[in-house]
Amino acid sequence: MSQFSFTKMHGLGNSYIYVNMFEEQIPEEDLALVAEKVSNINTGIGADGMILICPSDVAPVKMRMFNNDGSEGKSCGNGLRCVAKYAYEHKLVEDTVFTIETLAGIVTAEVTVEEGKVTLAKIDMGAPRLTRAEIPMLGEGETPFIRENFLYNNHRYAFTAVSMGNPHAVIFVDDVEQAPLTTLGPVLETHEMFPERVNVEFIEILNEEEMNFRVWERGSGVTQACGTGACAAVVASILNGKMERGKEITVHLAGGDLMIAWIEEGNVLMKGPAEVICHGVYEYKIEA
């Protein structure tokens, strides 16, 4: 029987099991199965996945993120805010501004601290990737995919594809509560046009500075929030002429609000909370 200490944290209800790999050890070959086991709501701790906080050669810390089906993702906006909180409060970093390595590249985090506790984290998510090759999706590699039609159940849905280090398909609807989240979501996620699958967001524009947001996450299904998805939604809204670049946009997710801005210099900034739920020790056994 093996075990490791963990901290369960959430960003707007998007919860992960966080493991400090400066102190703990999980064999590389076991990571996918351990993520699946620990995320199980009935037989594990229950979460949207597992995130490892690891040493890095190029930044103070590195984030590795696993979905609850065991697949490894390249980035996670809510996860990055929680990693920033954990790293500062556990003295893995000293400054309130620092970098975090991800499989999608290096991002910059800035934490707001009150009485030694991080109350807010802002992440510079970098520039969005907009070509088919970067997302990735099938088709002519250097072309963008903006407001293209997809036929489902005799209804045409127009979506825009954006990568924030992971792929997103953003669909504008009149009412997110009536959106086909659990039906169209998995169909698009696994469609052959996306070789690495895709996260699917349904967006309802409220005004020039606010939107409602619901998400079907690749490898996890319906979640309360998706930070990279919120960034992609704002980028897609600007590309479609629905919002103005440079303004801070309030994104109302099922789990709460994020503040997102696609600044003129090119990068996308995300600001929001990160919360600790509990600490514990998880025991597991990998069958031979």
From Swiss-Prot:
The protein's name is: Diaminopimelate epimerase
Its biological purpose is as follows: Catalyzes the stereoinversion of LL-2,6-diaminopimelate (L,L-DAP) to meso-diaminopimelate (meso-DAP), a precursor of L-lysine and an essential component of the bacterial peptidoglycan.
Query: Record's InterPro entries?
Result: DAP_epimerase_AS (IPR018510), DAP_epimerase_DapF (IPR001653)
Subunit-level organization: Homodimer.
Is Membrane among this UniProt entry's keywords? no
Pathway participation: Amino-acid biosynthesis; L-lysine biosynthesis via DAP pathway; DL-2,6-diaminopimelate from LL-2,6-diaminopimelate: step 1/1
Q: Tell me the organism's taxonomic lineage.
A: Bacteria, Bacillati, Bacillota, Bacilli, Bacillales
Where located?
Cytoplasm
Gene3D superfamilies per record:
Diaminopimelate Epimerase, Chain A, domain 1
- Active site residues per record: C76 (proton donor), C226 (proton acceptor)
